[in-house]
Regions:
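Non-catalytic amphipathic alpha-helical adaptor/oligomerization segments
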Residues: 2-137
Length: 137
């Protein structure tokens, strides 16, 4: 993929993340997730970041999707649990998106997969992805 195209995709993913953050959390920047309230949660998040740094992006994504599935609306999570999970997912995908193209290629991952992952998490949590997609067009 041409460098221009990958930079354009990287910006598009970042804009998706920013837009979702503003709409759902009222913040324009991503900060340390509020979900890091206890040591176990913080440890899991830090393990995921370490795995990403090792190139194990697909493994992290699988675990993230599994965690998200446990907070599906039919599992009756609280609204704050659902939003905390979304915030975690957005942070993870932002971290992945911040990696350079060569790293992503070595890790068998693409920026398109970042965007697909964001939309998948939102779909699992029953958050209206159509509204987000319309805003980004």
């Amino acid at each position: 993929m041409a460098k221009y195209q990958t930079n354009k995709t990287k910006r598009a993913v970042y804009n998706t993340l920013r837009c979702i953050g503003v709409m759902l959390f009222g913040q324009n920047r991503f900060k340390q997730p509020k979900f890091l309230e206890n040591a176990a949660q913080k440890d899991k998040y830090e393990v995921w970041l370490g795995m990403i740094d090792e190139g194990k992006i697909n493994e992290v994504e699988n675990e993230l999707i599994e965690e998200t599935e446990q907070r599906r609306p039919d599992m009756h999570p609280s609204e704050s649990e659902k939003m905390a999970m979304l915030e975690v997912a957005l942070q993870i995908y932002k971290y992945i998106n911040d990696k350079d193209d060569a790293f992503l290629e070595r890790s068998s991952y693409s920026r398109e997969e970042v965007e697909e992952g964001i939309l998948s998490v939102m779909h699992i949590l029953h958050i209206d992805t159509d509204m987000i997609c319309r805003l980004l067009v």
